[in-house]
Amino acid sequence: MRLNTLSPAPGSKPSAKRVGRGIGSGLGKTCGRGHKGQKSRSGGSVRPGFEGGQMPLKQRLPKFGFTSRKSLVTAEVRLGELAKVEGDVIDLATLKTANLITKDIKFVKVVLSGEIARTVTVNGLRVTKGAKAAIEAAGGKIEE
């Protein structure tokens, strides 16, 4: 058996629809497009969401909410990821050098997910209750 001898199982692939090949085919002349109108023309289609000039649903519904500017510069770091940071003191700069957060992040919160085995000092980061308990149980401490 070679790659050039492989073929699909008989009957598994339907034959292509050959349009414009006479009346007997069932798809002759207008090729299944009907008569006249925008959708019968080549390239004739309306964009998704267009409702024929009626005000589209997307514009009929009210706007709501906003994106907080602070959320764009805030990140969460899991407890398990702190093990990747070299050194005993963990702050914003060390998280950036360890590639755990991007350079535009200004606020970080440490959340309880995973576990930490070594002693670390978390400096200037917000920490959840569960993460704080886990860090202190491992012999670490939190500094504001």
UniProtKB/Swiss-Prot annotation:
InterPro entries the UniProt entry points to: Ribosomal_uL15, Ribosomal_uL15/eL18, Ribosomal_uL15/eL18_sf, Ribosomal_uL15_bac-type, Ribosomal_uL15_CS
Source superkingdom: Bacteria
Cysteine pairs bridged by disulfides in the record: none
Record-linked Pfam families: Ribosomal_L27A
Ranges in coiled-coil conformation: none
Regions of compositional bias (Gly residues) in chain numbering: 21-31
GO molecular function terms noted in the UniProt entry: rRNA binding; structural constituent of ribosome
Assigned GO CC terms: cytosolic large ribosomal subunit
Keywords: Ribonucleoprotein, Ribosomal protein, RNA-binding, rRNA-binding
Disordered: annotated segments: 1-57
Gene Ontology biological process terms from the UniProt entry: translation
UniProt cross-references to PANTHER family, sorted A to Z: 50S RIBOSOMAL PROTEIN L15 (PTHR12934), LARGE RIBOSOMAL SUBUNIT PROTEIN UL15M (PTHR12934:SF11)
Role, per record: Binds to the 23S rRNA.
Record's subunit section: Part of the 50S ribosomal subunit.
Similarity comment: Belongs to the universal ribosomal protein uL15 family.
Protein name: Large ribosomal subunit protein uL15
